[in-house]
Amino acid sequence: MKTICFVSMGDLLVTKGGIHRVTSCLMNELEKRGYRCIYLFYPIDESCYYTGNVEDEAHRLSPEQVEDYLTKEKVDVVINQQALFSTLLTKLISGFKLRHFIYISVFHNTPAIYEKTFTFSRLWYNFLHQSGISAKMSNCVRMLVYPLWKRRVVKGAGKMYAVNYDASDKCVMLSSNDWPILGYYLKRDVSEKCVTIHNPLTFDTVETTECLCHKKKNVLIVSRLNNFEKRLDRALKIWKKIEDDGFGEWHLYIVGWGLQENMLHNLAQKLKLKNVHFEGRQPSEPYYRDASLFMMTSAVEGWGLTLTESMQTGVVPIAFDSYPALHDIITDGYDGCIIRDNDLDAYAACIEELMHNREERERIARNGLMSCKRFEIDKIVAQWVKLIENL
């Protein structure tokens, strides 16, 4: 029996986001196949580690204690779930006297994430809303030298990726379309270490076509309310067009919370939207069961678990063509709809057509119920088992 240690940031609360939901699914399914899975996590300041899923002193480890902990637990495989965002774990492991385990780094988003999200508008928003003088000055300087600053950010991302890539036995990407992007940042061929494993379905079951009989005139968004990545302001502007075109019987439900929640509330009021409901942090499954359509407006995603969640619950997903893995999930017009990035008019027109045409809506939903089975947990875990056993 092999012991696998998953390492990520934050406790394993599945409502936190995609990485946590996927980690929980994989751990549960690998344990069913005879593996022993343990979880190690660090807080946002990366100052220490916690064992299990408990953030208290009894479970706290200093970085210097991690090597002994992994040895004591007889860990065979360490899976770093934060390879896109931190080199802390990699540098720690690289300093071990004797490494007795396989090290796998997972890139849970496209390597282009920093280039796509560190925008001038983000700096301007931070400048307006941060209260500290030093923070305002820092953002002001960055805006003044924005092209140079962004080039530095992108270069720094490449260095971070290189540290994690070089120290890993294998690197897991969610889409083969991301391989050349990682290669661009590393300035080398990455085929030697990279392997593609898609994310699994995260709900326990795929609904039957009978679920389509119970759908309401609801449109759904499930997302962190982080506007720089998720671009929910665009969703509200699209919804404004839809309301203005007379679709007053349809309602938009936004499930999630985040830093820009107040800003989005204010924008909805400014646009005088009538049928928009901010639901906060809630279990999302009941909302999927009621919804007919799902909106994604993100600037960037790694996989987009909410798309496969919508497909397995009979909801038609609609997304901007803004990230590589989207085409691994959706075939436009067959099991979802892909809209040219930033074309708000085309997005609104697509939704309105589906609102008008129940037959077309249900055709796409039925196809989604079938095609999402490509990502059933058994099929995805089999790929993980093959990777682990062949290293």
Could you say what each language-model-derived stretch is?
Residues 20-25, 217, 226-241, 259-265, ...:
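A conserved mid-protein helix/loop that constitutes part of the nucleotide-sugar donor-binding site
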Residues 80-86, 107:
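Short His-centered aromatic/hydrophobic patch
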Residues 143, 147-193:
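A short, active-site helix/loop in glycosyltransferases that binds the activated sugar's phosphate group
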Residues 262-281:
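Nucleotide-activated donor-binding/catalytic signature segment of Leloir-type glycosyltransferases, i.e.
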Residues 299:
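Aromatic "clamp/platform" in nucleotide-sugar-dependent glycosyltransferases that forms part
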Residues 316-320:
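Short hydrophobic beta-strand element within catalytic cores of glycosyltransferases
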Residues 321, 331-333, 337-344, 353-358, ...:
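Conserved acidic donor-binding segment of nucleotide-sugar-dependent glycosyltransferases
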Residues 346, 353, 360-374, 382-386:
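A short, well-ordered alpha-helix in the C-terminal region of glycosyltransferases
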